């Protein structure tokens, strides 16, 4: 009888320890996921929206529906005759075509 009782206590202790480890793993995974989401949200807040100037930060454009916007630059001649480069975040033509095809496919195939 003592052996069965001792074995039962040992079994309950091991089960308790393993379930505590499992819950710790779940908590750690939740914390990691939450930190990842917070980092993504901060990066999203720091990004440059579509049609806004990106002359000083050419890699900081936000994401669109499918693709990240690209910094597109043009040379502008000012009234004083100086040429300056002006850049804005936009969707390149090949990305627009891909989004059009995907949108069309979604309408057809539901």
UniProtKB/Swiss-Prot annotation:
Main location: secreted
Prosegment location in residue numbers: 21-44
S-S pairs: 47-62, 54-71, 61-89, 73-87
Compartments where found: Secreted
Record's keyword annotation contains Ubl conjugation: no
Signal sequence, start to end: 1-20
Keywords: Disulfide bond, Knottin, Secreted, Signal, Toxin
InterPro entries: Spider_toxin_CSTX_knottin, Spider_toxin_CSTX_Knottin_CS
A matching Pfam family: Toxin_35
Recorded superkingdom: Eukaryota
GO CC annotation: extracellular region
GO molecular function: toxin activity
Expression sites (tissue/organ): Expressed by the venom gland.
Domain notes: The presence of a 'disulfide through disulfide knot' structurally defines this protein as a knottin.
Family designation: Belongs to the neurotoxin 19 (CSTX) family. 03 subfamily.
Record-given protein name: U1-lycotoxin-Ls1kk
Annotated organism of origin: Lycosa singoriensis
């Amino acid at each position: 009888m003592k052996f069965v009782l001792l074995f039962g206590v040992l079994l309950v202790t091991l089960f308790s320890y393993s379930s505590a480890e499992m819950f710790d793993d779940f908590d750690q995974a939740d914390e990691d996921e939450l930190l990842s989401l917070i980092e993504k949200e901060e990066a999203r807040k720091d990004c440059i929206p579509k049609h806004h100037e990106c002359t000083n930060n050419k890699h900081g454009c936000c994401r669109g529906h499918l693709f990240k916007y690209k910094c597109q630059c043009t040379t502008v001649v000012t009234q004083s005759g100086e040429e300056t480069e002006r850049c804005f975040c936009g969707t390149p033509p090949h990305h627009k075509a891909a989004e059009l095809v995907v949108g069309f496919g979604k309408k057809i195939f539901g």
